Amino acid sequence: MASKATLLLAFTLLFATCIARHQQRQQQQNQCQLQNIEALEPIEVIQAEAGVTEIWDAYDQQFQCAWSILFDTGFNLVAFSCLPTSTPLFWPSSREGVILPGCRRTYEYSQEQQFSGEGGRRGGGEGTFRTVIRKLENLKEGDVVAIPTGTAHWLHNDGNTELVVVFLDTQNHENQLDENQRRFFLAGNPQAQAQSQQQQQRQPRQQSPQRQRQRQRQGQGQNAGNIFNGFTPELIAQSFNVDQETAQKLQGQNDQRGHIVNVGQDLQIVRPPQDRRSPRQQQEQATSPRQQQEQQQGRRGGWSNGVEETICSMKFKVNIDNPSQADFVNPQAGSIANLNSFKFPILEHLRLSVERGELRPNAIQSPHWTINAHNLLYVTEGALRVQIVDNQGNSVFDNELREGQVVVIPQNFAVIKRANEQGSRWVSFKTNDNAMIANLAGRVSASAASPLTLWANRYQLSREEAQQLKFSQRETVLFAPSFSRGQGIRASR
C-alpha cells in the first residue's frame, strides 16, 4: 500500500510539474507575440560616488520574450549574483578580481606592513598579512568577461571609464529563484544611494497595475544593503575574530557612497604582468589548432582523456576586438566578430554568446535571422538604422537606434542593419552559446543556394532578372555603401 501511495505521489508531482512547465512555456510564447518592437532605454538611474548604474525594465514584454535583463555600470564593490553575467568592456584599462569557491589560490604573496588598531586583528599590535587573490585579470578595451553564477567579484577602473555593459539571463538554468534580478553585495550600502535618488527618477512609461505590482516586488529584492547588514555585529565579530566596531563597519550602515566608490591611489594589489605581445602572437602562443579541436571534442561529449576542463582552469576573458577573432571582414564595409562556446568555453555554462559588429558609414549587414536564439542589440557608438520583420511579413520595428539604446530581436525574426553617415558599432547578446544566423542576401545566403528556376517562378522573374538577383551580390555578410544604395548591378556592367 505504501508503494502504491508513493507511486501515486510521484505521478502527481510529475503531472503537476508537466502542467507548470506547459503553462510557463505557453506564457513565454504569448510574451513573444510582439506586434510592435520599440527601442528601449533605462527606466532607473542610480548614481554612486564613482559611477552610474542604469537599469532596464525586466518586466518589459520584449525582455520577457528574450528572458533577459540589461544594465550598465561604471570600482564596483565586491558582489555576487544569482545569475551568470557576460561583460564586454569599452574602456582603456581596468582590473578585475574573481573569487572562485573551491579553486586553488592563483596569486599569493606575503608583505611586511605596519597595521594596528581598528585596521588590525583584535588586540591591535603590529604584524604581517598575506594577500590572497583567486583570479586577477588585466582588462583592456574590447575584453569580454564571463562571471559564473554565485561567484564573488570586484572591478576596478584605473583609467577613464566610458561604459560597461552587463547582461543577465533570468531564465538561465542555474537561476533557481524567480525572474527578479538580484545582486548580493558583500560591501557598501547600495540601498542608501538608491533611496536618496528615488524622488529624482524620471517617470517610467504608463504601466498596467499588474506590471506596477511586479515592479514593486522586484524593487523589494533590489538596492538593499550588503549581506552583512542582516547579521548581528556580535556574530560577525566572532566569525571574523575582530571587535564589534570593525564588524559594524562591515555592515556599511553609515556608508553613503553607494555601490561604486572612488579608491584613489589606495588600491595596491599584486597583478599579473601586462602582455606586451601582439594579438597575433598571443593567439599563436595560446593553443594549437589540434589542442583546440581536442578540447572542443571533449566538451561536446566526444572522446576524452578523462581529465575535463573545470571552472577553475577556464578562461574568464577574451578580447573580441582582436582582429584574429573577426569572423567577417570587408575593408569597405566593416567587420563582425562572434564569441561562442567554441572560442570561449565558459559560455557553454552561461548558455550565452556575444557578437561585436562595426559598420562603416552607410554600409549594410545582410538581412538575416538568428536560428536558435533571441538577440539583444545594444549600440555602443554612432547610430544604426534597424528594420525587423515578423513571421507574417509585418514590419515590427523600423527606426534609428542611437548610442545607449537597446532593441530585442526575437528568434527567427528577420533583421537588416545600416549604419548612418558616421558609421556605427554595436554589441549583441544571444541566448544560446552557439547562436547561428542565416542570411537572406549575399554569396553564402539561402537565396544564393536556391535553384535559379525557383527564383524565376516564385518571384515571377525572367531568367535574366533571376540571374542578376542571385549572382549580383558577391559579398558574403557585409555590403559596402555602393551596394546598399542599389548601385551594385550598375557598377558590375
Swiss-Prot record:
Q: Name one GO molecular function term.
A: nutrient reservoir activity
Chain intervals for the UniProt region annotation (Disordered): 190-229, 269-305
Which CDD domains does the protein's record reference?
Answer: cupin_11S_legumin_C, cupin_11S_legumin_N
InterPro entries for the chain: 11S_seedstore_CS, 11S_seedstore_pln, Cupin_1, RmlC-like_jellyroll, RmlC_Cupin_sf, Seed_Storage-Functional
Q: Which domain of life is it from?
A: Eukaryota
UniProt keyword Transmembrane helix, yes or no = no
Q: Where is the signal peptide?
A: 1-20
Disulphide connectivity of cysteines: C32-C65, C103-C312
Which key words tag this protein in UniProt? Disulfide bond, Seed storage protein, Signal, Storage protein
Low complexity: bias regions: 191-221, 280-298
- Pfam families, A to Z: Cupin_1 (PF00190)
Q: Which residues form the Cupin type-1 domain?
A: 37-248, 318-467
- Subunit-level organization: Hexamer; each subunit is composed of an acidic and a basic chain derived from a single precursor and linked by a disulfide bond.
Question: What function is annotated for this protein?
Answer: This is a seed storage protein.
> What family, per the record?
Belongs to the 11S seed storage protein (globulins) family.
What PANTHER family does its record include? 11-S SEED STORAGE PROTEIN, PLANT, RMLC-LIKE CUPIN DOMAIN, RMLC-LIKE JELLY ROLL FOLD PROTEIN-RELATED, OS03G0336100 PROTEIN-RELATED
- Name the UniProt record assigns to this protein: 11S globulin seed storage protein G3
